[in-house]
Amino acid sequence: MKIKIDESYLSKLEQLALIRLKNEEKDKISNDLQRIIDFFEKINELELKDVEPLFHPISSGKLRKDEPLKPLNRDEALQNVKRKENGYIVGPRTYGE
C-alpha cells in the first residue's frame, strides 16, 4: 500500500503531534516524510523469505574474561580530579544556585 503524504495526511499528523506547522515547514516536513515512507516501502519490497532472523548482529561474542583488579586508594582516585574537597569529588551544580 503506497502512502502519500498530502495536505490532509499532514494535517492529521499535526493534530496527533499537537503542533502547528507554518506553510514553509509543511512543505519541508511533507517532503522529508515522503522520503522516509518511500525508503521503508523499499525495505518492504525485499525478499526475505529464506533469510534466517538474527537476534544479534554478531553471531559469536568475543568477550574478555573479567579479572578483578586492585582497587584504587582514595589518593589515587582523586589524583586527576579537578575539584575536590575533604577527600570527595566536587561536581558541578545540577539544581539551584
UniProtKB/Swiss-Prot annotation:
InterPro entries: Asp/Glu-ADT_sf_sub_c (IPR036113), GatC (IPR003837). It holds the Pfam family GatC. Its EC number is 6.3.5.-. Heterotrimer of A, B and C subunits. It is an enzyme of class 6 (ligase). One of its GO terms (molecular function) is ATP binding. The gene is gatC. The keyword Nucleotide-binding applies. This is Aspartyl/glutamyl-tRNA(Asn/Gln) amidotransferase subunit C. It comes from Sulfolobus acidocaldarius (strain ATCC 33909 / DSM 639 / JCM 8929 / NBRC 15157 / NCIMB 11770). The keyword ATP-binding applies. Keywords: ATP-binding, Ligase, Nucleotide-binding, Protein biosynthesis.
